[in-house]
Structures are given as structure tokens and as C-alpha cells.
Design a protein with these regions (language model features):
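Alpha-helical scaffold segments in carbohydrate-active enzymes
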Residues: 76, 80, 101-104, 124, ...
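CBM-like carbohydrate-recognition segments
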Residues: 31-96, 105-124, 128-144, 148-167, ...
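Extended ligand-binding groove/face enriched in aromatic
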Residues: 112-119, 127-239, 244-250, 357
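Bacterial N-terminal signal peptides that target proteins for export
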Residues: 1-10
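Oxyanion-binding "anion nests"
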Residues: 259-305
Length: 398
């Protein structure tokens, strides 16, 4: 055992440790019948599943965050997802997050096939958003349309999205439904919509898109951001909800959505935007809070302040957090000396959940709060977050 420990330590030090880790049997609560039905529904819609036998875990990936090693892991996961998913592409948010990951992967890896798949997707849907507007989820696919437009300058790629955003600006704001009086009433919305609006500004120069973005983000932040914990509640119904240990309920994926939304918005926000400093300050506050509660395995549990009640790490939230931290370092908004070790540990932790065929597991199914899930569970949005994280980690070496 001592010799084996020395071998592992030397391999880690060399940045060449190969993923032969196998998770121990978990005592985590199993999904309820209702949650299992949700898993089945997700599988029927082709954006994820949780098989009883997903096969062996990968043994050919390095924990190193050097560009070549990260690229290998990204390709393995991206190729598995693209092959099984492309025939079923849709415009719902569960897919659009994957599309953002594919766009980032093409840029990072220098491989046009993922971007080409996105162009084909846009053509399939005539570059239109889903119809349930102003719902932020249904705006999210516009991020990919706009990124393709900024590369190819084809006005047809953004004309329907621009028409829809302009209609939102012209309509009365908010809803009369209690808790939903603002457009972005749940924290996930801050990943889904704001990057669309900042990209529309980049595409058109229209200041009105940034004005709406800044105004609506401020409303959501005022309602859902806890200025003590520096974390976001999922929505106003969770303001008084607590975990089993009595602490406030903060969902890892929800907070990952917010952090990811901040950096994806900042990347297209002009330097003189009056709210820019507020976004950066909130990113710094959240990064500090999340780094302090990173688990020993490098990841975050579904319930951030009650990790003892969630044995298994949750990959979609962890990947979004890792993406935001790496993007924050690359943007000069976060201190590399402080956050690089956090990022390295998180990336290594995520690789423990890559299977031999490329499946990325330990992703919580769709929902609104921490829930039990299976080790094999893999969903498109978690893969998208993983690819975003890998792309930013590779930039750290440029």
C-alpha cells in the first residue's frame, strides 16, 4: 500500500495521473418514483438518461490541465454526445446549453465539426427561438445563433431573434403571478437570457439591449441574491427553505447558472457599461464563497451548504462553477494564484465521472432544487457546461 501511495503521489506531481478511480458504493438517497419518472421523461426527449449499467469508467484520461490533456477529455465527451444527440436537436434550454459548449469546443479545439453541427441546427429551425417568450429559457438558443452570426455575418441568422427581443422591449414587463412579477424570476434565467442580450448588443450596437439586461439583472439580484452567503436562491419560494442540517437551501446548479451567466455576459459587455463593475463584484463574491465550500474531491454537492446529505458530487453545477472560475481568471476578474488550484482540483474531480465510451455521469436530472440522482445520469446541459469549462481551462495556458 505504501508503494502504491508513492506511485500515485508521483503520478499526480507529474500531472500524468490516469483515471482508474472507481467510486465507492454511495449511501446517497436514491431517486423517488416521481424523480425516476422525470428521468424517464428526459430520456424520452433524448436529452439524457441514467442507465443501470453504463459500462466502465475511462482509464485513458490525465488529470493534468495542460491543453493537450484537457483537449483529449473534451473530445471524448463531445464526440459521444454529438453522435447520440444530433438527430434529436431541439431549441429547449436543455439543448441550448450543450450548443454553447459545442461552440466553445470548436473554437478551443480548432475542430469545425461541432460548429458545423450548430449551423445545421440553426438552419433546421430557421434560426427561430422557441415560442414561449419572454421566458428566458426559450431565448437561450439565441446565444448560439448570435455567435454564428458574429462569425459569418449572415443577417438571416439573427433576424428572428432580434424581432423577438424587440417585441419583449415593446411589451409590458413582468407577470401578475405572485413570485413572477419580474421577467427573470428564477436564478437559472441569468444564464439563459442575459448572454443573448449582450451578444445582440455586440451584433447590432443597440444600447437598448444592454439597458434591458442591466435593469432586469438588478431586479433578479435584489430579489434572490443573499448578501451574507453570497449565493443565489433558486427563486423566491426558496427564501425560507432549509436543508436537513438547518442551513439555507442553495442549489449548486442554480448558482453555477448565475456564475456562468455573469462571465458569458461580461465577455460581450462593453468596458463602459455602468453595471459592469457590479457583475464583476458579484462574481468575486460568489467565487470566494464557492471556493471555500469546495469538497475534498474537488466538486460541489447539489445542496451547497449541506454536503453531508448529498454523498455524490453533482457535475453540471460543478462544471458551471469551474467554467466561471476559469473564465474569471482569463478575463482578469479573478486572481489566478487563488483560483487556479481550485480549478485544477475541480477538473480532476470531473474526470472521475467520465466513462470509457465518453458518457459524462453524475449529472442531476432537470429540476429546481437539490435532488437524488444516479451515478450514471448524463444530460446534455451538463456536457455543455463541461465543454465550456474545458475550453476556458485551455485558455489559461495561452
Amino acid at each position: 500500500m505504501k508503494a502504491q501511495a508513492r506511485t500515485v503521489a508521483l503520478a499526480i506531481a507529474a500531472g500524468l495521473f490516469i483515471c482508474v478511480y472507481r467510486p465507492l458504493a454511495s449511501a446517497q438517497k436514491q431517486p423517488t418514483p416521481k424523480e425516476l419518472q422525470n428521468i424517464a421523461t428526459n430520456a424520452a426527449r433524448h436529452f439524457g438518461d441514467a442507465p443501470d449499467d453504463p459500462g466502465p469508467l475511462a482509464t485513458d484520461l490525465s488529470y493534468s490541465i495542460k491543453p493537450k490533456a484537457v483537449a483529449k477529455a473534451m473530445r471524448k465527451v463531445a464526440d459521444w454526445q454529438l453522435e447520440r444527440s444530433q438527430p434529436y436537436f431541439d431549441r429547449i434550454w436543455t439543448w441550448s446549453v450543450l450548443y454553447s459548449g459545442f461552440m466553445a469546443a470548436s473554437d478551443s479545439l480548432g475542430d469545425p465539426k461541432y460548429r458545423d453541427a450548430m449551423t445545421a441546427m440553426g438552419q433546421k429551425f430557421d434560426w427561430k427561438l422557441r415560442s414561449h417568450l419572454p421566458n428566458a429559457d426559450d431565448q437561450s438558443v439565441g446565444q448560439t445563433y448570435l455567435e454564428l452570426y458574429l462569425l459569418k455575418k449572415d443577417p438571416a441568422m439573427i433576424a428572428p431573434t432580434k424581432q423577438e427581443l424587440d417585441a419583449i422591449l415593446a411589451a409590458p414587463r413582468g407577470s401578475r403571478i405572485p413570485g413572477k412579477e419580474i421577467d427573470w424570476w428564477w436564478c437559472d434565467a441569468l444564464f439563459m437570457a442575459p448572454p443573448v442580450w449582450s451578444r445582440m448588443y455586440a451584433a447590432t450596437g443597440g444600447r437598448k439591449y444592454l439597458d434591458y439586461l442591466d435593469e432586469e439583472w438588478a431586479k433578479t439580484s435584489d430579489r434572490l441574491y443573499d448578501t451574507t452567503e453570497h449565493l443565489y436562491f433558486r427563486d423566491s419560494t426558496y427564501l425560507t427553505r432549509t436543508e436537513a442540517n438547518g442551513k439555507k437551501m442553495f442549489w449548486s446548479r442554480g448558482n453555477g447558472w448565475v456564475m456562468g451567466g455573469i462571465v458569458r455576459t461580461l465577455q460581450y459587455l462593453p468596458k463602459d457599461d455602468p453595471a459592469r463593475a457590479k457583475y464583476i463584484e458579484q462574481l468575486k463574491e460568489m467565487a470566494s464563497s464557492l471556493a471555500a465550500i469546495q469538497s475534498p474531491d474537488g466538486l460541489w454537492r447539489a445542496g451547497l451548504l449541506d454536503p453531508g446529505d448529498y454523498d455524490m458530487p453533482e457535475i453540471s453545477g460543478s462544471a458551471l462553477i469551474t467554467f466561471a472560475l476559469a473564465a474569471g481568471v482569463n478575463g482578469g476578474w479573478l486572481d489566478q494564484k487563488v483560483y487556479r488550484p481550485v480549478i485544477e482540483k475541480a477538473w480532476a474531480g470531473m474526470l472521475h465521472h467520465v466513462y470509457a465510451d465518453g458518457r459524462l455521469g453524475s449529472i442531476q436530472q432537470t429540476g429546481a432544487e437539490p435532488q437524488p440522482f444516479k451515478a450514471s445520469s448524463s444530460y446534455t446541459y451538463g456536457v455543455g457546461a463541461f465543454l465550456l469549462a474545458g475550453s476556458e481551462i485551455r485558455k489559461m495556458h495561452r
